[in-house]
C-alpha cells in the first residue's frame, strides 16, 4: 500500500503489477537517455560557434534520425503489447466476482456461490477504530483466495465509475450497460486498498475498495460462513 510522502509506485502484489513496474523503469530509462542527449546538444549549440551554416542537407544524419526513433518506438511498443495481452488474458479462473458501481458504493456478487453478495460502503471517519485508514476502510471487504486466477466482471448501475487497486495493477472502467473484465491474482496475503478512479459525483472520493487476500482454506471457511 501507499505510505506518507511516498514518491515511487506501490509495492507490486500481482504478476501484472510487477511487469508494469519493469516496463515503467524500462521506459523511464529511455526517456532519461533521450533527454540527456537533447540537453547535451542544446548545451553545445549555446557554448560553441555555429559551423556549417551553409549545409543544405546531410543524408547520413537524416537517415539516423529517421531510423533511430523507429527503433526506440519498437523497443517501447513490444513490451507494452506483451503486457496488454497479459492483462486481457484470463485462463481458467477459479472464481468469478461481479462488481457493480453505484453512487457512491460498490456491490459484489460471487457468481459461483448462491446468495453470496453484499454492498461495500466506506466507514465514516467518526466510526474508525485505532489504526484504520481514513477514507479507505469499508464495512464489507472483498475476500478472495491468493495465488489463484480470479475474474472480476465490472459494470455500473448509474454513472461511469472505475474500479482500481494500484498494488495489483488493476484499473477497469465500470460503464452502465457494458460488462468489462479483469484478472486478479495476488502473490501474497494481505489487505490491498483502492478507490474509484473516475469522477462520478459529489461523493466520488468516498468509494474505497478493500481486497482481503487469504489462503484458500480461509476463503472457504469465510464463504461458508457468509452463505
Curated annotation (Swiss-Prot):
Keyword flag Phosphoprotein: yes
Modified residue annotations for Phosphotyrosine: 218
Biological process per Gene Ontology, one example term: response to hypoxia
Residues the entry annotates as binding Cu cation A1: 161, 196, 200, 207
E.C. no: 7.1.1.9
NCBIfam families: CoxB
Protein name as it appears in the record: Cytochrome c oxidase subunit 2
Gene: Mtco2
Amino acid at each position: 500500500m501507499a505510505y506518507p510522502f511516498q514518491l515511487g509506485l506501490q509495492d507490486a502484489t500481482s504478476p501484472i503489477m510487477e511487469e508494469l513496474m519493469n516496463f515503467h523503469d524500462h521506459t523511464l530509462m529511455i526517456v532519461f537517455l533521450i533527454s540527456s542527449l537533447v540537453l547535451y546538444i542544446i548545451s553545445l549549440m549555446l557554448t560553441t560557434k555555429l559551423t556549417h551554416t551553409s549545409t543544405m542537407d546531410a543524408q547520413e544524419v537524416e537517415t539516423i534520425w529517421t531510423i533511430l526513433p523507429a527503433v526506440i518506438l519498437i523497443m517501447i511498443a513490444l513490451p507494452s503489447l506483451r503486457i496488454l495481452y497479459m492483462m486481457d488474458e484470463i485462463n481458467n479462473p477459479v472464481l468469478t466476482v461481479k462488481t457493480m458501481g453505484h453512487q457512491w458504493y460498490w456491490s459484489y456478487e460471487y457468481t459461483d456461490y448462491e446468495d453470496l453478495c453484499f454492498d461495500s460502503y466506506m466507514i465514516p471517519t467518526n466510526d474508525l477504530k485505532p489504526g484504520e485508514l481514513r477514507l479507505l476502510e469499508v464495512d464489507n471487504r472483498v475476500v478472495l483466495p491468493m495465488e489463484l486466477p480470479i475474474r472480476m466482471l465490472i459494470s455500473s448501475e448509474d454513472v461511469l465509475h472505475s474500479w482500481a487497486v494500484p498494488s495489483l495493477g488493476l484499473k477497469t472502467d465500470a460503464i452502465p450497460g457494458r460488462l468489462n473484465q479483469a484478472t486478479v491474482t495476488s502473490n501474497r496475503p494481505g489487505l490491498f486498498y483502492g478507490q474509484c478512479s473516475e469522477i462520478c459525483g459529489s461523493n466520488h472520493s468516498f468509494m474505497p475498495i478493500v481486497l482481503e487476500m487469504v489462503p484458500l482454506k480461509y476463503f472457504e471457511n469465510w464463504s461458508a460462513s457468509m452463505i
